[in-house]
């Protein structure tokens, strides 16, 4: 039998599943403005692409903001609603193979969860800064809405045309415990010659630095170094370099595991697997 997880978001629905032997099946996502349409579309596409019969599905674990639109069954298969934050924590630990970490879900907004194997995940808080911020400000500053295009453009950007750095304020930052290449103020030095590429990189840097610093504070509060980054923003092109810089600046281990964009839905499916095993 197969245990399915479905994460119903505002603009896309993600689906992941585990076989009875614990093997993860290839996750996928479906875009749709209507959550009900996207749920049925995702499940239909999943069964078709994996040659899965509905009767092979033991249960469907539903999570996400749009999960309220899903009833007690889909195509006749039972649905169980599970905590999104619990799913974030379980998925992050599973993908990273860590026993204890801060798990960050980077979606339209950002949520931070403290997860430890065998324990209930703890929601630490979050911020409205996330993918929605990037979409909105890209529209206002650049006249662009497709984040993949904005991300591609950001790769050729120059932050020195946008951000105020510690080196712009003092040459003695090291004596204060500050690296010269640290950001003093995002968008604090926007040049008249700043290009769209520069502004694009500035936007990504502002959002990712905000998420990174919140992750640092959360990690220090729990006495851990490992931070697992999940959600669709975790795999967008400028993320890797920006988070690598934060790793080098602070005593952190920011991790982006394989399938990180599916962390929450994988965590939901894992919850179903564990419930099934406990009943055996």
Each language-model region and where it sits:
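Conserved phosphate-binding catalytic cores of ATP/NTP-utilizing and phosphoryl-transfer enzymes
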Residues: 70-104, 109, 113-119, 266-272
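Glycine-rich phosphate-binding/hydrolytic loop that grips phosphoryl groups
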Residues: 90-95, 134-138, 254-280
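Adenine-nucleotide phosphate-binding core of ATP-dependent small-molecule kinases
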Residues: 176-226, 261
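Short glycine-rich, Thr/Ser-proximal phosphate-binding strand/loop in the N-terminal lobe
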Residues: 2-41, 121
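Conserved phosphate-binding/catalytic loops in two-lobed NTP-binding clefts
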Residues: 79-85, 244-267
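Glycine-rich phosphate-binding loops at beta-strand->alpha-helix junctions
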Residues: 62-70, 217-246, 261
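Short beta-strand-loop/turn "lid" adjacent to the catalytic site in phosphate-handling enzymes
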Residues: 29-32, 47-84, 96, 120-123
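Glycine-rich phosphate-binding loop plus the immediately following alpha-helix
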Residues: 119-174
């Amino acid at each position: 039998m197969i245990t399915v997880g479905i994460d119903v978001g505002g603009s896309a629905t993600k689906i992941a599943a585990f076989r009875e032997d614990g093997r993860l099946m290839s996750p996928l996502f479906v875009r749709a403005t209507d959550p009900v349409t996207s749920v049925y579309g995702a499940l239909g596409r999943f069964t078709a692409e994996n040659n899965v019969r509905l009767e092979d599905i033991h249960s469907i674990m539903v999570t996400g903001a749009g999960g309220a639109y899903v009833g007690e069954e889909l195509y006749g298969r039972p649905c169980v609603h599970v905590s999104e934050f619990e799913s974030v924590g379980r998925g992050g630990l599973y993908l990273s193979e860590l026993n204890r970490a801060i798990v960050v879900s980077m979606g339209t907004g950002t949520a931070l969860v403290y997860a430890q194997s065998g324990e209930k995940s703890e929601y630490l808080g979050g911020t409205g800064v996330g993918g929605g911020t990037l979409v909105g400000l890209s529209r206002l500053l650049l006249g662009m809405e497709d984040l993949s295009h904005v991300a591609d453009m950001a790769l050729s950007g120059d932050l020195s045309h946008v951000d105020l750095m510690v080196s712009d304020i003092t040459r003695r930052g090291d004596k204060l415990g500050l690296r010269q290449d640290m950001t003093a103020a995002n968008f604090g030095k926007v040049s008249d010659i700043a290009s769209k590429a520069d502004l694009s990189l500035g936007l990504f840097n502002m959002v990712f630095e905000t998420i990174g610093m919140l992750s640092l504070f959360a990690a220090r509060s729990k006495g851990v170094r490992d931070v697992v980054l999940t959600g669709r923003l975790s795999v967008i092109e400028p993320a890797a370099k920006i988070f690598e810089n934060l790793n080098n600046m602070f005593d952190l281990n920011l991790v982006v595991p394989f399938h990180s964009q599916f962390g929450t839905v994988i965590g939901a499916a894992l919850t179903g697997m564990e419930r099934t095993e406990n009943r055996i």
